């Protein structure tokens, strides 16, 4: 298939550029892409790439934000592994975005002042109807280990990718079904090893479930990868599974000690399950528990194993990838383009894809990076639900690429 030029794709997608000739015709009123106002009575509950279960609140009149870490593997203090920032909150002020191409887009995007650890990379939130995505405050991680084990190299994350929903499905019977799962995890105590999440998950109404992994240390196995899903006691509306198997081997533990939290957003009449793995570590023996490290953490998305029709998911989506870059994804038929929405003309920052809707597994659209050294061999996978997609590419198996995007227009 001959790939369209980036310029022609851009002109077809108003999020990225304004193209064509002028006109004196009256302009139709701008249709908002998000609520005209928000306050703290609306809470976006969701997951972060850090493995955190988060509540985000915005007040677009007072221009303030608040992030509450309900569950977290991220240490509260650099140089330690516990306690984490679970149960704590951060606050700050908002600035409406001005760097997007149109007012329609800027009025639904905000910078979270004080949230980033790198002033050249602002933390931003993009708001839609019932969904908010972007980034939440980052953290500098470092730990010297215990007797040479569990060392976490010094690294500063300016922010973490996040997606959350204003309405959740809290009845597990309504979540039961078979899903494709795509995501990524990182293991800080293994030099931040990045691991793909690629599996099939079947969830039953009684909380029992099964995961069949296509990658990771459990590739080829089908098993219940944690305790039965139940309502999390933290009151977040999420479901929890204990002793949740990771995609890698724990650094210092005989078995899985991390937890899984499934946040099921309700969006456009569909469920959008986000499954995070929240790792854990203990560096002391004062509690009578020996030191341990099962700090693999991350995020994934689930979507039903239901066939996706060609052209049914066309449109523009916005999100953040696991390289901590903001991404607009324009999908048109069998082609997709990922572009930096703040620098849309920079071709070097873009990624062009060919999509294949054959779907040997229902609901799993494969993709090929145009011009990649892998040629026409599919290295990527897309899943879709409720106007949200998850995209995993393993062109380089040691550094899988992942992003979640939500529909804009």
What spans do the regions from the language model cover?
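Bacterial N-terminal signal peptides that target proteins for export
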Residues: 1-7
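C-terminal motif of bacterial Sec signal peptides marking the signal peptidase cleavage site
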Residues: 15-18
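Mature soluble binding/inhibitory domains
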Residues: 21-409
């Amino acid at each position: 298939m001959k790939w369209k030029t980036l310029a022609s794709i851009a002109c077809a997608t108003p999020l990225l550029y304004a193209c064509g000739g002028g006109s004196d015709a009256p302009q139709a009123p701008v249709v908002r892409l998000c609520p005209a106002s928000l306050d703290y009575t609306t809470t976006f509950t969701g997951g972060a790439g850090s493995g955190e279960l988060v509540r985000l609140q915005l007040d677009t009149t007072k221009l303030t934000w608040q992030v509450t870490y309900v569950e977290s593997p991220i240490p509260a203090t650099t140089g330690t592994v516990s306690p984490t920032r679970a149960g704590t909150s951060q606050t700050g002020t908002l600035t409406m975005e001005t760097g997007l191409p149109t007012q329609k887009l800027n009025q639904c995007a905000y910078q979270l002042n004080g949230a980033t650890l790198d002033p050249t990379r602002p933390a931003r939130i993009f708001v839609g109807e019932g969904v908010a995505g972007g980034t939440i405050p980052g953290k500098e991680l470092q730990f010297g280990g215990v007797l040479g084990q569990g060392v976490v190299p010094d690294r500063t994350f300016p922010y973490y990718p996040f997606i959350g929903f204003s309405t959740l499905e809290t009845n597990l019977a309504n979540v039961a079904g078979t899903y494709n799962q795509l995501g990524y995890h990182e293991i800080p105590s293994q030099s931040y090893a990045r691991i793909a999440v690629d599996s099939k998950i079947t969830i039953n109404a009684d909380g029992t479930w099964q995961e069949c992994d296509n990658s990771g240390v459990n590739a080829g196995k089908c098993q219940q990868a944690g305790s039965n899903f139940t309502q999390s006691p933290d009151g977040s509306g999420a479901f929890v599974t204990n002793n949740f198997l990771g995609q890698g081997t724990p650094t210092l533990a005989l078995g899985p000690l991390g937890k899984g939290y499934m946040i099921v957003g309700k969006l456009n009449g569909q469920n959008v399950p986000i499954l995070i793995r929240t790792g854990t570590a203990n560096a002391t023996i004062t509690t009578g528990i020996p030191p341990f490290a099962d700090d693999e953490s991350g995020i994934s998305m689930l979507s039903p194993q239901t066939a996706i029709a060609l052209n049914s998911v066309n449109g523009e989506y916005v999100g953040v990838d696991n390289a901590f870059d903001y991404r607009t994804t324009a999908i048109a038929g069998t082609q997709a383009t990922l572009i930096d929405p703040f620098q849309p003309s920079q071709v070097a920052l873009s990624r062009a894809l060919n999509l294949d809707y054959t779907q040997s597994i229902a609901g799993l659209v494969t993709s090929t990076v145009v011009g990649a050294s892998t040629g026409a061999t599919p290295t990527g996978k897309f899943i879709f639900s409720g106007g949200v997609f998850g995209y995993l590419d393993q062109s380089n198996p040691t550094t899988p690429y992942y992003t979640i995007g939500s529909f804009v227009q």
